[in-house]
């Protein structure tokens, strides 16, 4: 007697990240038809990431007026930017996600001026915003724009926060398989999936985007064993089919 799985499994392998081009998961999903749920194989140490924050990158520009530094002329765009950056460091949103926690804000780049004796009329800085389901990405951008003197332009608003609740079979199966659940601080293709998904895969997220990024062979072996156990637990959640 055999026990086929009570669902179909489709393996999708994508080489593009969620923030890159259109030939990765964006091209794959329309070809799959209806999808009920997904398991995303990003490196998590084979623990179960039940949610992840979204991402909005803001290109900000402070506008001033050029002048000679010795004569105290002009309006220093760098100072305007610094005031905005200080405001961002202590900024708090009115709502906080129960699953994903607070929205994260980090200024990661700044550029101003070309000469030591000229007051800069422009200062550009970049803000990395890790969004949650407490606000849409568009709402988050609007709130931050209202708080800043600088112009703020989002590169994209499509990388959205995502989470799956503890009562979903994806999560219940992970717990039954002995996996710890947590909220991932990083984004993945999960954010582009309009259906419940869990992130769990071999390797360590701390190695991502580093020189000579790698996954150990023993981590792959562990991953295979965990996936087998997990799929079995997930099948139990949906009820095994038995053929006589």
Residue ranges of model-derived segments:
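Metal-dependent amide/peptide-bond hydrolase catalytic core
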Residues: 15-17, 43, 48-51, 57-244
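Acidic/histidine-rich catalytic neighborhood of metal-dependent amide-processing enzymes
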Residues: 1-57, 61
């Amino acid at each position: 007697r055999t026990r086929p799985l009570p669902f179909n499994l489709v393996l999708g392998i994508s080489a593009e990240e969620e923030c890159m081009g259109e030939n990765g998961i964006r091209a794959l999903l329309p070809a799959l038809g209806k999808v009920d749920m997904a398991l995303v194989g990003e490196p998590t140490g084979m623990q179960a990431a039940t949610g992840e924050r979204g991402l909005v990158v803001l290109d900000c520009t402070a506008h001033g007026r050029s002048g000679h530094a010795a004569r105290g002329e002009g309006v220093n765009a760098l100072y305007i930017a610094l005031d905005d950056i200080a405001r961002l460091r202590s900024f708090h949103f009115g709502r906080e996600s129960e699953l994903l926690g607070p929205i994260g804000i980090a200024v990661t780049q700044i550029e101003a001026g070309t000469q030591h004796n000229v007051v800069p009329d422009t200062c550009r800085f970049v803000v990395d915003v890790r969004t949650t389901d407490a606000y849409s990405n568009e709402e988050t951008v609007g709130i931050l724009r209202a708080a800043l003197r600088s112009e703020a332009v989002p590169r994209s608003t499509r990388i959205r926060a995502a989470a799956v609740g503890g009562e979903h079979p994806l999560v219940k199966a992970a717990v039954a398989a002995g996996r710890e659940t947590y909220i991932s601080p990083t984004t993945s293709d999960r954010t582009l999936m309009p259906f419940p998904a869990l992130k769990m895969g071999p390797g360590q997220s701390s190695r991502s985007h580093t020189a000579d990024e790698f996954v150990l062979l023993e981590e792959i072996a562990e991953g295979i064993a965990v996936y087998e156990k997990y799929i079995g637990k997930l099948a139990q959640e949906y009820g095994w089919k038995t053929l006589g």
